[in-house]
Amino acid sequence: LIAGNNLELGAHAVLNAGTTAARGGTVTLGLAGNSSGMLTFDVDAGSGSTPTINVAGADPNIAQNGGQLWLRVPRTVNADGTTGVRISNSGVHVVGAREIDVEAVKVYDVTGSPYVDASLAMADSDARAYIAAANIKAGIGSLTGTSVTAFHLMPGIELDSGGNLRLLQNASRTNSGIDLHTYRYNGEPMVLTLRAAGSLLINGSLSDGFAAPVGSPDGNIF
């Protein structure tokens, strides 16, 4: 479920991606990267009921059988300088998750310089500052039923172009691709989203965690 503005789960809402025969499923909730809205989990003041998200697997005694909850929301900066995300959480019960991934998104309009490699340095610097100041528990509140070790906070970097978007500005034998494995934030990877109103031109390799790309004779790898 992705909303352009607000996304609200009512106090009695149940999202069930659990299973009795395999690994649990994935529930994705989020807002558009430039949204000023909120992802809200309500609580019933009378009964105390809160939304339930079930991603449990077949065997609750096997941690890796659990499913995944992915929250994709814009970043925020608090009055005290700490950083958070656009989530208002009065209480939500998460059942059986092996991990809860929080993608804290910032959108960059790169129309004036529509090259992925030329935009990553600034985005990486912003992401490192954001993660260093992150107060994730204050930003999300309490997601009950899941251990703290299941939380993963990672920066989402969305590069948007009003025209074409090209992976490499100057592709060559020595500049044949982008290796994202060097971009880590407390051990977590970035989540890179590329959007182009025109053409998305992949004129090199894009990898994370593999061997260094090998240049082709014309400098382009497809």
Residue ranges and their predicted role:
Residues 1-222:
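Extracellular and secretory-pathway beta-repeat/beta-biased strand scaffolds
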